[in-house]
Swiss-Prot record:
Keywords: Acyltransferase, Cytoplasm, Transferase. GO terms for cellular component: cytoplasm. The gene is aat. Belongs to the L/F-transferase family. Signal peptide: none annotated. It comes from Vibrio cholerae serotype O1 (strain ATCC 39315 / El Tor Inaba N16961). This is Leucyl/phenylalanyl-tRNA--protein transferase.
């Protein structure tokens, strides 16, 4: 069966409606265009994101169902809380965004690295614009885990995470959910559900539900200071929001 897919024009930033995305492969919406910051930003504003393999053209996606976290309801496993009390990883926001993006690429097998040089450069430039943010987890002075994504009002579009030490990415997500919700963040987009996300408590929204949430949350801002460079946990206060 032939698949008809929209090719994006390099001359405009227009995307087809997310509701025209394919069912198989789930969410594939368009191909082509470029990775101009204006295009990427326009995509996230519509619930669309780029993802493509080493041999692919630029592909644009809007899957359904959509994996999400409600940061106000996120609860880490008791074992993770116990681990953090003992090991006292440090957790920061926007201290090493470029390093986090690089590690998210390097910790995957070469044939699965969708975060190529062009993508890493684009997200790095979005960070300079204050649109891409990271959470870092440190063991001493070593970066051992983290996550990064794009902020769209009260919605955070999580892009990738990595872990080089036990529980590091789980601790990054835990502290970020608490921090984001305290600053009136409402939803964290995780794109496509997988067993790991499900084990962490992710749920799903239909495309219609996700787009409705996006339209509402993107017009509202998180509280001032949410994405300032800061520490969320240090050895003197590693679990300030424990039960």
């Amino acid at each position: 069966m032939a698949i008809y897919l929209t090719e994006l024009s390099p001359e405009t930033l227009t995307f087809p409606s997310p509701f025209t995305a394919l069912d198989d492969p789930n969410g594939l919406l368009a191909f082509g265009g470029d990775l101009r910051l204006e295009r990427i930003w326009a995509a996230y504003q519509q619930g669309i994101f780029p993802w493509y393999g080493p041999e692919d053209p630029i592909l644009w996606w809007s899957p359904s169902p959509r994996a999400v976290f409600d940061p106000t309801r996120f609860q880490p496993a008791k074992s993770v809380k116990k681990f953090q009390r003992k090991h006292q990883y440090r957790v920061s926001v926007n201290h090493a965004t470029s390093q986090v993006i690089e590690q998210c690429a390097l910790t995957r097998p070469a044939d699965q690295r969708w975060l190529n040089d062009s993508m890493r450069h684009a997200y790095g430039e979005l960070a300079k614009q204050g649109r891409c943010h990271s959470v870092e987890v440190w063991q001493g002075e070593q970066l051992v885990g983290g996550l990064y994504g794009i902020s769209v009002g009260q919605l955070f579009c999580g892009e990738s995470m990595f872990s080089l030490a036990t529980n590091a990415s789980k601790i990054a997500l835990w502290y970020f959910c608490d921090h984001f919700s305290r600053h009136q963040g409402q939803l964290i987009d995780c794109q496509v559900m997988n067993p790991h996300l499900q084990s962490l408590g992710a749920t799903t929204l239909s495309r219609e539900q996700f787009i409705q949430s996006l339209l509402s949350f993107k017009e509202k801002q998180v509280l001032s200071g949410c994405f300032e460079t800061q520490w969320l946990a240090t050895p003197t206060s590693p679990c300030a929001f424990e039960d």
